[in-house]
Swiss-Prot record:
Annotated source species: Shewanella sp. (strain MR-4)
HAMAP family in the cross-refs: HSP90 (MF_00505)
Gene Ontology CC, one term: cytoplasm
Protein name: Chaperone protein HtpG
Region ranges (A): 1-345
Length: 637
């Protein structure tokens, strides 16, 4: 009795199918790469499960992928004898996209084919790529260890629905038949298929086979009889684990194709490192830095990590124990000789071998990035534009490598006059003034706010470089990166400016004299502002602006307050220190005011101006506007 059911595709699948058919038409042949990749993964999974249950092989342990074509019928079939799927598995895997953040992914699509094709490639189209060339797809599958009459038939024309039925299938594994569109019949040509397999599948460790027709008995050139040969399945790829081959034998093209196989990205990697480690631990790693950030890089639920193999046997995807979170963009694999074949995620968590390997792999990636930064600054900037903000998590997460990570960071600076983050901390150190002991920086809400901050006035006048930080993560970074190569990082908006030897004796004396002369004014402003400020001081950092606000040492900065508020965290009240510039005409005029009410209004106006300049917002903007209008009106009379 038939058990056929019709199911509707998940909404996102419909969207993906439509977009894929229209966006990936220039790279149609990737359907074969994706389907062969999936078939090879199914073989890897069976090999892993059979470690504890040999019966799953059902007497056939020679794992392989077979590809055949029928020109007359216009079909291509990809068949594997891997792990196979149950009915529930078919409905789940071939009817939905089981990825977190899928809705967000679709929001990122622009409708522009070239941009969308890049995003779709990063998303990983997998099985659905079949519909790029097929008007109908038929899947016959039986899960390893299940009875022949528990096999499943899945069919769809890629529109809105698919059918599922129960069938009988003698052999385990999955067979996918593509019924090609009329305009895609070129893919039913065996030579075309062979060229694609050679291009995309040489690195796959499972044999990929195509049928080689036999030949009849025939006469040779000298009249001798050449015996008939039987047809056979011919292996079309090298079928050895690429990472176990000698580096000198592997071409750049093979490395790039392997990257696409394991990452399901279809843009080239930026760089890679293939390394064999011998000693206390023996393992091979092949690590890739992608050229583009994945669309869901900031999604907390996103799986990341390396593929783990033990003695060439695939164990698991996304083994995040080998890679710190701030390097979560790294793709690749690790093949260990020391871990047990029955290793689990729990065992990996607290394993001394894992920890040693993680340390080694982290150093390897940092070394790759250091070499890239030294050898190819332009390419490093490309990396930084994609992954720089993630790398900034490093100093907080990885104390042991904090200095190395800091050396890889890039910032905008007053030296370049550009918003582009191209300045390293070593660049900064090389340009420090004689007698300078600190690395000066400012964190603001935008590059413009940082570059135009009044806190930079004296430093600009003296030609002292300041790093300009304006990313959300910068305040977090700077809380964990307090020094670099024995030079303290010092905020120009916090506490005293502390120029040390950069300020000569005459300047210090003049500053002290000005502060002494302005003491009565400072006291009047303190009285006028009352509890709204922590303190009032004469500034040592302003030259052209009447006043500014400064965060006290040990107090939370305005940027950190915003981060905490955005995360829904309670924030303590922080009162600023108000610094005035007595040399500015507005402040000297303020000093002459005898009307205490007007004095208080002007003092408040200067304070709120300074707060607006520092934070970009005010707690009560309406009160500020009202005060502004009142002052303007008074001066227009």
């Amino acid at each position: 009795m038939s058990q056929q059911e019709t199911h509707g595709f998940q909404t996102e699948v419909k969207q993906l199918l439509h977009l894929m058919i229209h966006s990936l038409y220039s790279n149609k042949e990737i359907f074969l790469r994706e389907l062969v990749s999936n078939a090879a993964d199914a073989a890897d999974k069976l090999r892993y499960l059979a470690l504890t249950n040999d019966a799953l092989y059902e007497g056939d342990g020679e794992l392989r992928v077979r590809i055949s074509a029928d020109k007359e019928k216009g079909t291509v079939t990809i068949e594997d004898n891997g792990v196979g799927m149950t009915r529930d598995g078919v409905i789940e895997h071939l009817g939905t996209i089981a990825k977190s953040g899928t809705a967000e992914f679709f929001k990122n699509l622009s409708g522009e084919a070239s941009k969308d094709s890049q995003l779709i490639g990063q998303f990983g189209v997998g099985f659905y790529s079949a519909f790029i060339v097929a008007k109908k797809v038929t899947v016959r599958t039986r899960a390893a260890g299940h009875k022949a009459n528990e096999a499943v038939l899945w069919e769809s024309e890629g529109e809105g629905s698919f059918t599922v039925d129960t069938i009988t299938k003698a052999s385990r594994g999955t067979e996918i038949t593509l019924h090609l569109r009329d305009e895609e019949k070129e893919f039913a040509d065996e030579w075309r298929l062979r060229s694609i397999i050679t291009k995309y599948s040489d690195h796959i460790s499972v044999p990929v086979e195509m049928w080689q027709e036999g030949t009849p008995e025939r006469d040779g050139p000298d009249g001798e009889k050449i015996p008939a040969t039987e047809g056979y399945w011919k292996v079309m790829n090298k079928a050895t684990a690429l990472w176990m081959r000698n580096k000198s034998e592997i071409s750049d093209e093979e490395y790039q194709e392997f990257y696409k196989h394991i990452s399901h990205d279809y843009t080239d990697a930026l760089l890679w490192s293939h390394n064999r480690v011998e000693g206390k631990q023996e393992y091979t790693n092949l690590l890739y830095i992608p050229s583009k950030a994945p669309w869901d890089l900031w999604n907390r639920d996103r799986k990341h990590g390396l593929k783990l193999f033990v003695q060439r046997v695939f164990i698991m995807d996304d083994a995040e124990q080998f890679m710190p979170s701030y390097l979560r963009f790294v793709q690749g694999l690790i093949d260990s000789n020391d871990l047990p074949l029955n290793v689990s995620r729990e065992i990996l968590q607290d394993n001394h071998i894992t920890k040693a390997m993680r340390t080694g792999i982290t150093k390897r990636v940092l070394g790759m990035l250091e070499k890239l930064a030294k050898d190819d600054a332009e390419k490093y900037q490309q990396f930084w534009a994609e992954f720089g903000q993630v790398l900034k998590e490093g100093p907080a997460e990885d104390f042991a490598n904090r200095e190395r990570i800091a050396g890889l960071l890039r910032f905008a600076s007053t030296h370049t006059g550009s918003a582009a983050p191209t300045v390293s901390l070593d660049d900064y150190l090389s340009r420090m003034k004689e007698g300078q002991t600190k690395i000066y920086y400012i964190v603001a809400d935008s590059h413009e706010a940082a570059a135009n901050s009044p806190h930079l006035e004296l430093l600009r006048k003296k030609g002292i470089e300041v790093l300009l930080m304006s990313e959300r993560i910068d305040e977090w970074l700077i809380n964990h990166l307090t020094e670099y190569k024995e030079k303290q990082l010092h905020s120009v908006t916090r506490g005293e400016l502390e120029l040390g030897e950069l300020e000569d004796a005459a300047e210090k004396e003049a500053q002290e004299k000005l502060a002494e002369e302005s003491a009565p004014l400072v006291e009047r402003i303190k009285a006028a502002l009352g509890a709204s400020v922590a303190d009032v001081k004469v500034t040592s950092r302003l030259t052209d602006t009447p006043a500014c606000v400064v965060t006290g040492e040990g107090e939370m900065s305005s940027q950190m307050i915003k981060l905490m508020q955005a995360a829904g965290q309670p924030v303590p009240e922080v009162k600023p220190t108000f610094e005035i510039n007595p040399a500015h005409p507005l402040v000297s005029r303020l000093n002459d005011l005898q009307d205490e009410a007007a004095f208080a209004d002007w003092s408040n106006l200067l304070l709120q101006q300074a707060q607006l300049s520092e934070k970009g917002s005010l707690a009560d903007p309406s009160a500020f506007i009202k005060l502004m209008n009142q002052m303007l009106l008074a001066n227009l009379k």
